[in-house]
Amino acid sequence: MIKIPVYFMPGLAASSTIFERIQLPVTHFEMYFLEWQIPKKSETLTAYAKRMAEFVTHDNAVLVGVSFGGVLVQEMKKYLSVRKVIIISSVKTNLEIPLRMKIVKSTKAYKLVPTTLLQNIEVLNKFSFGSMIQQRLKLYEKYLSVRDKTYLEWAIEQMLLWDRTDADPTVIHIHGDADEVFPIKNIQNCIVVKGGTHIMILSKFRWINENLPKIILNETVKTT
């Protein structure tokens, strides 16, 4: 049996370790993991997507992107012959971006984001108060390992300035009804995961492991 190649793209600042709990049947699928590259000076999202597409070495592959990685794989699709594009905890157009992000975009307040904080998560962890904050910072420390200042500033800007207004009807969208970054009320035409937050690639991995193969193979999916 010819196995289906599935390429996974993590979210903003995340490494492919966020997919460590994802398992697809080895009889049907081969899993490949993409990593963020440092953008070139003044590189557009389109140019970056074209460069990232070179890491996909199979025709008719499946692209799976999380959050900003979901935006990227939609742009990469322009340069590849793909079987499917699946986005998780992401958006299909800038119309699905919440109002607070649009305000940040219009005021250009994103240029004031202290990316140095993301570069020094270990320091934040030392001075954090409360077990919940420390637990979340430990998660960030483990999974958000891409902390290059050039990359962080570029990625935040590209996410906020994404100019797509028409959704690609072939893109399959999986979204949690408790997503705090991209609220479900703004999302159209998606497979809803009950209780899924923005990090459901970790917290809802059992649902994803059960249903992602079905989605790829066009089988019926459980939506609760």
What feature does the model see in each segment?
Residues 2-59, 105-118:
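Active-site catalytic motif of lipid deacylating hydrolases and related acyltransferases
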Residues 81-115:
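Flexible "cap/lid" loop of the alpha/beta hydrolase fold
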Residues 117-163:
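Conserved alpha/beta-hydrolase catalytic His-Asp/Glu region
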